[in-house]
Amino acid sequence: MIFNCVDLLTTLVIRFLSVIIGVSKQLPPYVMRKIEMEMNAAIRYRRNFSKANTSVRCFKTNGVTTDVDVFLHGNHIASLDTATHKLTIKDGGWQSVTTKSRLNALLDEFAPSMGIFQKDWVWYLSDRLSGSVVPFISGMTV
């Protein structure tokens, strides 16, 4: 098996820093489900998407996609502002394993240094680059 040295070095550095700052719950590379890859592709290419419990809705103004919303079981869990590339993440009222997985897939695509993990039933948002960990608040923008 041939490894890309840069990718391997980056992964090792991030893992080392994560251990030092105590954030080892969600380390790269994040293993994404197929539906999450399809969800991210739909957002990337600004296409509506619906499969199983996940849907993506693109909103256009004058023919240009301005906002993209993501839903899980009909609950709004994320919005991407295509002009500013800011991602707003929400729990949709359900802090479930699936919600966390979908949000982590979105963060992996649009805010790669960020991740959500859970400790003692409480969700946290971590930034692996700065080392900061803050309690997750539904509606926060990254």
Feature annotation, model-predicted:
Residues 5, 9, 13-142:
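Terminal leader/tail segments of proteins
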